[in-house]
Swiss-Prot record:
Stored HAMAP family: UPF0314
Primary subcellular site in the record, as a coarse category: membrane
Location in the cell: Cell membrane
Pfam families: DUF2585
Recorded family membership: Belongs to the UPF0314 family.
Protein name in the entry: UPF0314 protein Saro_1818
Keywords of the record: Cell membrane, Membrane, Transmembrane, Transmembrane helix
Any one GO cellular component localisation term in the record: plasma membrane
Highest taxon in the source lineage: Bacteria
Cysteine pairs bridged by disulfides in the record: none
Transmembrane segments: 13-33, 62-82, 96-116, 153-173, 177-197
Species, as recorded: Novosphingobium aromaticivorans (strain ATCC 700278 / DSM 12444 / CCUG 56034 / CIP 105152 / NBRC 16084 / F199)
């Protein structure tokens, strides 16, 4: 099959592999002692208060938009790898499973003491204690949804939507994927003060 004919959507095997990887991540997170659900004992589909004990504990929150963007970006990377460079060693049906592996690896790292402490020390997430397993699983699901959306939507639509999500969350909570990465890797005190309402 030529590069233009490569399909990046998973077949049944690819979908099962993606699900299996996600399930393995859930098992690892439980083994790490992460709480299965919010310690408050309540499960909500949405929690919109960033500075609260339930942030990153429920099914979705403001940072779910970032995970959708992860999916957009992972699909873009897969497109480059398979369509532009003809990555023949691995069938494109595994692209989603590979994206889930990357996202799941981040969820595991994000819930490790080193990253939790980093978030607490350099970002506005002063009380951050990691995600519930429910939230991590949902984050992986949002990434997969973003990946599958990008696989079907025109590139321009995906790009505009991603920028829209970034601007919307920047307006709503003074945070987004770009600022999250910036503050985690190279903290800027002025940004932290602004995010804190200063």
């Amino acid at each position: 099959m030529n590069r233009q004919g490569v399909r990046l959507l998973p077949d049944r095997g690819g979908s099962l592999a993606a699900f299996g990887v996600g399930l393995a991540v859930v098992i690892i997170l439980l083994g790490m002692g992460r709480p299965p659900i919010c310690p408050c004992g309540v499960v909500r589909l949405w929690h919109g208060v960033v500075e609260s004990a339930e942030n990153s504990q429920q099914v979705s929150d403001w940072y779910s938009f970032s995970h959708l963007i992860h999916g957009f970006l992972f699909y873009g990377a897969a497109h480059i790898v398979w369509r532009r460079f003809g990555f023949a060693e691995l069938s494109p049906r595994w692209a989603l499973a590979l994206a889930v592996l990357i996202e799941g690896s981040w969820e595991i790292l994000e819930n490790s003491p080193i990253i939790i402490d980093r978030y607490r020390s350099v970002t506005i997430s002063w009380g951050y204690s990691g995600d519930s397993v429910l939230n991590s699983a949902a984050d992986i699901g949002f990434m997969a949804a973003g990946f599958l959306f990008a696989a079907r939507a025109p590139v321009l639509v995906t790009v505009v939507l991603g920028i829209g999500f970034e601007l919307f969350t920047l307006w709503a909570i003074r945070d987004n994927l770009a600022l999250n990465i910036l503050m985690l890797v190279w903290p800027v005190e002025a940004v932290r003060v602004w995010q804190g309402g200063g």
